A protein has these predicted regions:
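Short, conserved beta-strand segments within well-ordered enzyme catalytic domains
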Residues: 35, 54-56, 76-80, 87
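SAM cofactor-binding core of SAM-dependent methyltransferases
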Residues: 8-62
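Generic enzyme active-site microenvironment
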Residues: 10, 35, 78, 119-120
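Glycine-rich His-Gly loop
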Residues: 15-16, 79-83
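Class I S-adenosyl-L-methionine
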Residues: 63-76, 83-200
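Residue-level signal for beta-strand positions within conserved beta-sheet cores that form or flank
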Residues: 6, 29-31, 158, 177
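A general structural signal for stabilizing positions within well-ordered secondary structure
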Residues: 4, 47, 54, 67-68, ...
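Class I SAM-dependent methyltransferase Rossmann-like catalytic core
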Residues: 1-8
């Protein structure tokens, strides 16, 4: 995938200050091409960390993928939507349907510019994404919206797989577990990196 990404563009949605973009750069050897974030302070930090990236200080929903990419093929589209309204760390606090629904923007990209690979990272509870009862997740419909999201990607011709991974198994100094989803439409298999640290 690395060689092909020199001929395709890489897009980081919900780019924040550039953590995911830095990881992508470490993996593929170059900066991401486009970074999108609604927060001016986050985009300012991203610009400082990734000065060669094209920046959009807008809501991910306000970006037209066709215009932003300018007809260039998209090799990788990365999504790290706000996780606070899924995380168990939030406790019993109310959740916001609009924030929980941010991941749907991945379908907008899939439908308009068809990235070869889509990756999404979030808290492990993301796979329990379901409808709300008032301002709380409906305990009887855990995972229903997540399944709809996955099926929508599949209807767009994507093969989809997901896993929960621990950062410490890949050399990061934290034991937290994160959810990762990979979707690809190029007919090639989804391959997960093998752990590099810890017990075999």
């Amino acid at each position: 995938m690395e060689r092909e990404l020199w001929d395709e563009i890489v897009v980081d949605n919900f780019a924040g200050g550039g953590g995911a973009s830095t990881g992508i750069k470490m993996a593929i050897g170059r900066d991401v091409d486009i970074a999108i974030n609604h927060d001016p302070a986050a985009i300012a930090m991203h610009k400082a960390n990734h000065p060669y990236t094209e920046h959009y200080n807008e809501s991910v929903w306000d970006i037209d993928p066709v215009t932003a990419t300018g007809g260039r093929p998209v090799g990788l589209c990365w999504f790290s939507p706000d996780c606070k309204h899924f995380s168990k760390a939030k406790g019993g606090k109310p959740v916001d349907k609009n924030i929980r629904g941010l991941a749907w923007v991945a379908l907008k990209w899939a439908a308009t510019v068809r990235p070869r690979v889509i990756m999404l990272e979030n808290v492990e509870e993301f796979k329990t994404w379901g409808p709300l009862l008032g301002d709380r997740p409906d305990p009887n419909q855990k995972g229903r919206t997540f399944n709809c999201f996955v099926n929508a990607l599949r209807r767009h011709g994507y093969q989809v797989d997901w896993r929960e991974l621990r950062a410490c198994d890949y050399g990061a100094p934290t034991i937290r577990k994160r959810f990762f989803l990979i979707a690809r439409c190029d007919g090639r298999p989804i391959v997960w990196a093998k752990p590099t640290h810890g017990e075999a």
